[in-house]
């Protein structure tokens, strides 16, 4: 019985991300017309990651319903592949990148919003859309982690993957600066080269920490759930 609400919830989250992406892309901002377009912003990349992840979740749920009780080994094999892809995407991309975007954005915003989200953007981006991009990502991914168990990859391969993503994005940001002479984020203009190197190194370390945090949190949630279920199954002493 719990499967149906989870399916509906995932569909709702997927539709919300599609709505956010469509509304964001419909905004005519000068930055969208420059080199790299929306793809130079980690927020936009994260939105795409979250939409793809929940799309995989919905597809996995549909496949699970269709293959249940069929006894078709090929369909079950394809379902296992989908589940593995879903779990890998959450572990390596959806959780660490999503939490990173929320945590770093609001930390810098609280210190000085002009360094990350200038007031000028209020003329283009409504408040609800800003929260859709930088706030609701966190509760959505935590809800998913709580409602379904996810098998994390080996720690070495997971950390290697998130490091590859982090370094790849840093190189992309540096390349954009090389081509345009402008940094993607305003605060990078106000710090020296040494501070930028420290910042980029720190972001990579933080991404690795968030990967490990997701792994620990996933284990804690489901070890606790397993313990509760085992306690319920124990015969009650009269």
Swiss-Prot record:
One Gene Ontology term of the molecular function aspect: hydrolase activity
- What is the top-level taxon of the source organism? Eukaryota
- Which residue numbers mark the site Important for catalytic activity? 43, 134
Per the UniProt topology annotation, the Extracellular ranges are: 31-44, 111-124, 180-193
Ranges in the Cytoplasmic compartment?
1-12, 68-87, 145-156, 217-238
Q: How does it sit in the membrane?
A: Multi-pass membrane protein
Role summary: Hydrolyzes bioactive fatty-acid esters of hydroxy-fatty acids (FAHFAs), but not other major classes of lipids. Shows a preference for FAHFAs with branching distal from the carboxylate head group of the lipids.
- Catalytic activity line of the entry: 9-hexadecanoyloxy-octadecanoate + H2O = 9-hydroxy-octadecanoate + hexadecanoate + H(+); 12-hexadecanoyloxy-octadecanoate + H2O = 12-hydroxyoctadecanoate + hexadecanoate + H(+); 9-(9Z-hexadecenoyloxy)-octadecanoate + H2O = (9Z)-hexadecenoate + 9-hydroxy-octadecanoate + H(+); 12-(9Z-hexadecenoyloxy)-octadecanoate + H2O = 12-hydroxyoctadecanoate + (9Z)-hexadecenoate + H(+)
Q: Could you tell me the EC number(s) of this protein? A: 3.1.-.-
Q: Which InterPro entries does the record match to this protein?
A: ADTRP_AIG1
Descriptive protein name? Androgen-induced gene 1 protein
Q: Which GO terms describe its cellular component?
A: plasma membrane
Spans through the membrane: 13-30, 45-67, 88-110, 125-144, 157-179, 194-216
Name one process (GO BP) from the record.
long-chain fatty acid catabolic process
Question: What triggers expression?
Answer: By dihydrotestosterone (DHT).
What are the UniProt keywords, alphabetically? Cell membrane, Hydrolase, Lipid metabolism, Membrane, Transmembrane, Transmembrane helix
Record has Cell cycle as a keyword: no
């Amino acid at each position: 019985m719990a499967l149906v609400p989870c399916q509906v919830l995932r569909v709702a989250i997927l539709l919300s991300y599609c709505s956010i992406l469509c509304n964001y892309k419909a905004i005519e901002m000068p930055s969208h017309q420059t080199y790299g377009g929306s793809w130079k912003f980690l927020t936009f990349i994260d939105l795409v990651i979250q939409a793809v992840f929940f799309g995989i979740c919905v597809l996995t749920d549909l496949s699970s319903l269709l293959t249940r009780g069929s006894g078709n080994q090929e369909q079950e094999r394809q379902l296992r592949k989908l589940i593995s892809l879903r779990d890998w995407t959450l572990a390596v991309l959806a959780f660490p990148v999503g939490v990173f975007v929320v945590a770093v954005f609001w930390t810098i915003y609280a210190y000085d919003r002009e360094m990350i989200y200038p007031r000028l953007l209020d003329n283009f981006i409504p408040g609800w859309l800003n929260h859709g991009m930088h706030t609701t990502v966190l509760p959505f991914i935590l809800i998913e982690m709580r409602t379904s168990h996810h098998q994390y990859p080996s720690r070495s391969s997971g950390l290697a993957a998130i490091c590859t993503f982090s370094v790849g994005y840093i190189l992309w940001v540096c390349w954009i600066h090389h081509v345009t002479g402008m940094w993607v984020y305003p605060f990078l203009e106000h710090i020296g080269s040494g501070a930028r190197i420290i910042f980029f190194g720190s972001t990579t370390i933080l991404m690795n920490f968030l990967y490990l945090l997701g792994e620990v949190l996933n284990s804690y949630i489901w070890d606790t759930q397993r313990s509760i279920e085992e306690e319920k199954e124990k015969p009650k002493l009269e």
